[in-house]
Amino acid sequence: MMRLLILVALLSAGGWLYYRLIYFFRDPERRIPEGNNIVAPADGTIVYVHIVEDGHVPISVKEDKIIQLEEITKTSMPTGRFWHVGIFMSPYDVHINRTPVAGEVRFRKHYKHQNLPMRWMETRRMLRLRPLYKDALHITENERNTLLIDGDLPVWVVQIADEYVNKIDCWIGEGDTVYKGQRFGRIVMGSQVDLIFPDREGIRIVVEEGQHVKAGESIVACY
């Protein structure tokens, strides 16, 4: 019996080490689609996709309080209509982030703050409960890194950290030129990446809530 317990303990420890040292850091190649499109910046599940008008984000995470777009980006935003897409990354998704479009990095800002857990969103995702963002206070509160990539159209990317994340990796900065699907960062464990871009004539959204996407490969919108 003791030998069995030791074997189980060793296998469990080995599995945990494999996940933490090998599986978590996997970085598969991706087929970057050609054409006029915006690709997913992260692997994960689409938790919301909606239009933002006058800076008002049409979701509520606490007591029906209206969220302002600038609460998510932590920086000033131009006026107008924007598409806002959220991608939740579970601990088992690939955690490498990729640029959604080609262009020049015009802006980068890191916002440090106390991190709240994302477990409510993970639970609702697993149970397929809608809306997936209910009670997800991390959307506006947690540490984050915001990028503005200016290409055919301006695209904001917001990396949002989870409770257990003490570091957001971002390997590009202001003035850098990037190509679509380029590796630009990583967030450890579970986390979230939001995507914001103008609602211009010809924009067509091709994802929906609950859909799983792959960074650099899955098309979010065409233009």
Predicted ranges, named:
Residues M1-Y223:
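Contiguous, well-folded functional domains in the mature portion of proteins
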